[in-house]
Amino acid sequence: MTSKMEFTDRAKKALEDAMALAEQYAHSQLLPVHLAVALLDPLPDPSKDQQNAPAGATSSLFRQVIERAHGDPQLFDRALKKALVRLPSQDPPPDHVSMAPSFHTVLRKANELQKTQKDTYIAVDHLITALAEEPSIMNALKEANIPKPKLVTDAIQAIRGTKRVDSRNADTEEEHENLAKFTIDMTAMAREGKIDPVIGREEEIRRVIRILSRRTKNNPVLIGEPGVGKTTVVEGLAQRIVNADVPDNLANCKLLSLDVGALVAGSKYRGEFEERMKGVLKEISESKEMIILFIDEIHLLMGAGASGEGGMDAANLLKPMLARGQLHCIGATTLAEYRKYIEKDAAFERRFQQVIVKEPSVSETISILRGLKEKYEVHHGVTISDAAIVAAANLAARYLTSRRLPDSAIDLIDEAAAAVRVARESQPEIIDSLERKLRQLKIEIHALSREKDEASKARLEQAKKDAENVEEELRPLREKYEQEKQRAKALQEARMKLESLRQKAEEASRMGDHSRAADLQYYAIPEQEAVIKRLEKEKAAADAALNAAAAETGGAMITDVVGPDQINEIVARWTGIPVTRLKTSEKEKLLHMEKHLSKIVVGQKEAVQSVSNAIRLQRSGLSNPNQPPSFLFCGPSGTGKTLLTKALAEFLFDDPKAMIRFDMSEYQERHSLSRMIGAPPGYVGHDSGGQLTEALRRKPFSILLFDEVEKAAKEVLTVLLQLMDDGRITDGQGRVVDARNCIVVMTSNLGAEYLSRPNAKDGKIDPTTRELVMNALRNYFLPEFLNRISSIVIFNRLTRREIRKIVELRIAEIQKRLQDNDRNVKIEVSEEAKDKLGALGYSPAYGARPLQRVLEKEVLNRLAVLILRGSIRDGEVARVVVQDGKITVLPNHPEVNDEDDEMMLDEEDAVDEVAPESEMDEDLYDD
């Protein structure tokens, strides 16, 4: 029967509560008395946030009816409970609770009432009217001094008035129930001190107040980049309303933030979302006090709740009220989303007045951070130094360019404070290691106590002594740690108390309780401030004493000060850019950088020097912050141009592959530029981003290697102009990518033909050759491209002596390769063999690459065969010597198969015969 009836949400809940009550009392039938109890004392609604429920929420409708009919609700409640207890219960409880005929009668009467009153749904008042005519309920009403059911009907009529039940939530008992459910009261939050102080933004707040004071179209929309403080402007307005710092027309208004997610969530049926939205708007328009509705991310309303089958969306429901000025609405959205969603709907857009929220400058950000400092200090229980605030604002502006101030700077402060707090609340390393040691000794003592032999007894005595020593060492450390922790905790609690007192003083002055406000302002607050100063002084004195006696006590164990170093650490962790202060070990490493790089790149002193100087400038902070160091490495093939870049990557990042490499031979066509910076709008792959721009966005501190740069199309190289000059590059979507912290390295073979000229004996480039190479570069590259390069380095040709040094490096590489592949074979190369390899691998035109081929042919091929054959086994030494003028790898074990030997000999002869013919022409660049 109930399946044909349509109930409001509250009536449906009352029926469910009545059924739950019958099950609780183990009654076999559902009776009207169950429904009466459920309506008189409804259970709390779990769908609503009980904490945010309005203070002094009204009593149930049934109670209001009893009171209006001049009855006693308590007597009525007692009579109902008495009747409920008298009902027979079953043990064990019944599996199914059925409806009694009297309950069916009540529902039928409620249904008839609904039809008579032309309501769409059966509401709570229909159920109460039907119950009042039921004999058992009539008896209870008589006990509550209500002799006739008509008194109940009249009371309901007086409360309900002429309202129609045309929606599922039309019979709400609480005033503004929809507002309580779907909005957050920002003025109440400001009153309770739950909103952070708003510093600055006066101009934007004044403009919002001016727009709200208009007669029509009084709806501002705050537009700005993410993180500039759009919501903060509204929070500032809420604080001004609470402090009565607004014009009279806004003096007693409420600022409510609409929760669009809660509004849409759970709206299963068609029309349910619209019903909720209409309920919210109706309550706003019927409210006695002025309500300003704040919708964060207002673009969510465009299409929110639309079913796709002609259903209304939220924006269309708002339009009529916005145009007439009945609804004061503040929106907030980003520039991109405003353009994408709101500008498309001109009718919706014209109802809002734009307020552009600009990004604050670094100095304004510092002021904002100083204002927020106390909140973060109280929350984390740390002290934030002013130097940390200045560092956070400056570093956020310089290194976190993809994000906006003040949001990025606030995040830095917050995370640095959290890091200090976590470090403080974790056990110091020294205590942790001693406790682990003590646990191990206790386990050892427990195990040895069962043993009977003399050695175990002696070991047991020793273990007990060790445990006592560790405990003695640990006791003072624990005491010291607890004392330091206690001091920090006491200070945090004192600060929290001060915050609470200030809040109470503000509340008292707002409420006009001047005596209490004066008492707090001139007695309690100064007293608490004095306590904090005393605690700070005691803590500073204790820390100073510990640091003075650092040799004996080891200094203070915990720190609770956030300084610039902590901020630097967070920036370095986020971006990978080394902005932390140079440690002594790192200083040493940078000072001896040439020595380290020269071990890998042989014979290129000038190139190594120029790269080292650029890195030192960058790390010491003396380089131009807007211009990344850029190099053009020229020289013959195989002289170490790319190798130097790999060595630099290994030096900086401990990984030779930690660089962004572009092989410019892949960028020979003009259109391949879109691969580097991303396809322009309208082209396929517009959203995917470019290889260069995306890599730089992810790793701002990296080495960019443009290999064989002269092979690329001229249009591709022009993109690098602004990258080398201003450290910025714009991708296909118009976003500026920061490239100020990278190192640009380009390699080129231009002018290599001039480098084959006979030079000085040490392989150095003479001035004439240098000029010829520079002319070749000038003839090929644009003047503005060459003019932006920090340093053009011409690599020297490798001499025989340098090739001989490279032999040592290559053999060390082979040894490492064997270890990486779990081959425990040690290679020993005689000095004579090394000289021979150096002589065979020397090629003025091809640099060090022929040496690799010689090593492969003369050593590696033969070594591979011997290892596979078992002539050289794991743990043995492979000796490379010169025999009869040839390089030979000596086997450690005699060969097993003669046929294989003959075959190998034939192969070696064949290799020797072919080798002279396959030798490369070393005079490739000769005219």
From Swiss-Prot:
One of its GO terms (cellular component) is cytosol. Required, in concert with Hsp40 and Hsp70 and small Hsps, for the dissociation, resolubilization and refolding of aggregates of damaged proteins after heat or other environmental stresses. Extracts proteins from aggregates by unfolding and threading them in an ATP-dependent process through the axial channel of the protein hexamer, after which they can be refolded by components of the Hsp70/Hsp40 chaperone system. Disulfide bonds: none annotated. Residues 454-473, 908-927 are annotated as: Disordered. Residues 562-752 are annotated as: NBD2. Has 2 AAA ATPase type nucleotide-binding domains (NBDs) per monomer. ATP binding to NBD1 triggers binding of polypeptides and stimulates ATP hydrolysis at NBD2. Nucleotide binding to NBD2 is crucial for oligomerization. Residues 7-87 are annotated as: Repeat 1. This is Heat shock protein hsp98. GO terms for molecular function: ATP binding; ATP hydrolysis activity; misfolded protein binding; protein-folding chaperone binding; unfolded protein binding. Residues 2-162 form the Clp R domain. It comes from Neurospora crassa (strain ATCC 24698 / 74-OR23-1A / CBS 708.71 / DSM 1257 / FGSC 987). Belongs to the ClpA/ClpB family. Transmembrane segments: none annotated. Residues 179-428 are annotated as: NBD1. ATP 1 binds at G224, E225, P226, G227, V228, G229, K230, T231. SMART domains: AAA (SM00382), ClpB_D2-small (SM01086). ATP 2 binds at G635, P636, S637, G638, T639, G640, K641, T642. Residues 99-162 are annotated as: Repeat 2.
